[in-house]
């Protein structure tokens, strides 16, 4: 099982079809390169969410599918500060200690208008746990700043890639996967999980829904409506009676 976890870019915002987003393109690489293996695709991207919410929903939205490989990207929704470094580390530790022991790849997308992302803080966590990372800021964005690409070719709003932009992001990930595949038979020692580099207050965070708790309600009601589409994310919660 190949999983992707992040915000709106991972979700596939502004791609013309779900199959055009970077995540599905990378999933297609797995299927093409390992044709004799049944490979499942899980996309846990939710627009506008950070690793703070991500660490609380990781079990139900991706880990319960027992993934073998996860690409993680909260680099444009997390602020570049120590708070989100801590929530991000909690997410990484939760994934690394999951029974399926997934391999993790850190992805850092970027705001194309400003060059801002959280990769400095995220990559400090990645280096501590010896995890590989892909920087769109240091590749696609760098080419754009050098005049090799135009912003309008990549993204209409300065943040979310169009189909071509998603293809560029996928190409950077696939380039790395090709290099790993070329050396896949080499032995590697399994790393021991080190102590956390932050206070790590969020590793055990859990999202509570109407399935787990029955709070006293004042002005709200439970929402038992079933999910109606793949973009219908926020279910089993509560709805306000007034706007």
Regions found by a protein language model. Give the residues of each.
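Alpha-helical scaffolding within the catalytic cores
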Residues: 1, 24-27, 51-64, 85-94, ...
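Serine-esterase "nucleophile elbow" of acetyl-processing enzymes
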Residues: 1-44, 57-66, 234-237, 243
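Cell-envelope and extracellular/periplasmic
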Residues: 8-9, 13, 34, 43-59, ...
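Sec-exported extracytoplasmic/periplasmic mature domains
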Residues: 31-32, 59, 63, 93-101, ...
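Active-site segments of SGNH/GDSL-like serine hydrolases
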Residues: 73-77, 86-124
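Extracellular serine-dependent O-acyl
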Residues: 103-108, 116-154, 167-181, 186
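Accessory beta->alpha helical hairpin/"wing" motif in late/C-terminal subdomains of nucleic-acid enzymes
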Residues: 161-162
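Conserved catalytic region of serine esterases and O-acyltransferases that act on ester linkages
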Residues: 167-243
């Amino acid at each position: 099982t190949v999983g992707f976890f992040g915000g709106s870019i991972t979700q596939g915002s502004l791609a013309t079809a779900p199959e055009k987003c970077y995540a599905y393109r990378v999933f297609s690489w797995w299927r093409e390169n390992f044709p004799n293996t049944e490979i499942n695709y899980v996309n846990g991207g939710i627009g506008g969410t950070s690793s703070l919410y991500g660490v609380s929903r990781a079990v139900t939205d991706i880990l319960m599918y027992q993934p073998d490989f996860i690409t993680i990207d909260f680099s444009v929704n997390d602020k570049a500060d120590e708070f989100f470094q801590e929530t991000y580390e909690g997410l990484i530790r939760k994934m690394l200690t999951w029974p399926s022991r997934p391999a993790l790849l850190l992805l850092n997308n970027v705001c194309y208008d400003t060059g801002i992302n959280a990769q400095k803080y995220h990559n400090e966590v990645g280096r501590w746990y010896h995890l590989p990372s892909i920087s769109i800021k240091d590749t696609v964005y760098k080419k754009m700043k050098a005049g090799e690409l135009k912003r309008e070719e990549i993204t209409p709003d300065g943040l979310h890639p169009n189909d071509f932009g998603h293809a560029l992001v996928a190409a950077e990930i696939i380039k790395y996967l090709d290099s790993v595949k070329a050396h896949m038979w080499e032995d590697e020692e399994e790393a021991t999980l080190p102590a956390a580099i932050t206070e790590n207050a969020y590793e055990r965070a859990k999202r509570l829904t109407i399935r787990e708790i029955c709070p006293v309600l004042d002005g709200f009601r439970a929402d038992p409506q079933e999910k109606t589409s793949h973009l219908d994310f926020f279910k089993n919660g509560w709805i306000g009676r007034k706007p």
